[in-house]
Amino acid sequence: MNTYNDNPKQCLKKIVESASAKFNESVDIAVNLGVDSRKSEEQVRGTVVLPKGIGKNIKVAVFAQDKHLLEAEKAGADIAGGEDLVEEIKKGRKLDVDWCITTPDFMAKITPIAKVLGVKGLMPNPKFGTVTSNIAEAIKTIKSGQVKFGTDKNGVIHGKLGNIKFDIDDLLENLKAFLKVIKDNKPISAKGIYFKGVFLNSTMGKAYKIGKVEDII
């Protein structure tokens, strides 16, 4: 493992320059936090809008009715439907999307497919802004580059900052935004060092550890 203390831009440059796979590798991040994920109050979860996007079209499905359904279609939802869509999913229809959105008044109607959506991490959640009456704004925000994040059982957050075709400065901007939101979501009960380690790598490449996070953001 190579370390470039306090120089994330140099890390990103090395990652992009050394990528050798025959496909467009993603640039990944792993953030090791000083939290105890076994405690619910120390689980760090949320969303962040990466200012330079993630390098792919983010697909959104909307469950709604009446005016909200029309709003979803107009705002560019990849899939939009009401109870008919719920029935199709109950019968086995696959949803090839990254996010699902619904309205507060329709939330109860997707209960029959909650398990199906939940397994894929697609269940609408007010904390993620995906249970809302402002469908158009939610679609716009998500498609601009919104991603979910959360600590695993070891207190590590994994995410993607883009891909090796991104400009280095764009990757750096996404990195800063990602780390800032994690910093802002620090649990009150977390003691000691919060950012224990931040590592960057491409899909097939080796990991680079960056230095002191507080100096970056």
Curated annotation (Swiss-Prot):
GO CC terms: large ribosomal subunit
The UniProt record lists the keyword Repressor: yes
Annotated keywords: Repressor, Ribonucleoprotein, Ribosomal protein, RNA-binding, rRNA-binding, Translation regulation, tRNA-binding
Annotated coiled-coil segments of the chain: none
GO molecular function terms attached to this record: rRNA binding; structural constituent of ribosome; tRNA binding
InterPro entries linked to this entry: Ribosom_uL1_bac-type (IPR005878), Ribosomal_uL1 (IPR002143), Ribosomal_uL1-like (IPR023674), Ribosomal_uL1/biogenesis (IPR028364), Ribosomal_uL1_3-a/b-sand (IPR016095)
Domain of life: Bacteria
CDD domains linked: Ribosomal_L1 (cd00403)
Pfam family, one: Ribosomal_L1
Protease in keyword set: no
Biological-process GO terms, alphabetical: regulation of translation; translation
NCBIfam families membership: rplA_bact
PANTHER family in the record: 54S RIBOSOMAL PROTEIN L1, MITOCHONDRIAL (PTHR36427), LARGE RIBOSOMAL SUBUNIT PROTEIN UL1M (PTHR36427:SF3)
Family, per entry: Belongs to the universal ribosomal protein uL1 family.
Function statement: Binds directly to 23S rRNA. The L1 stalk is quite mobile in the ribosome, and is involved in E site tRNA release.
Quaternary structure, from the entry: Part of the 50S ribosomal subunit.
This protein's name: Large ribosomal subunit protein uL1
Organism field: Wolbachia pipientis wMel
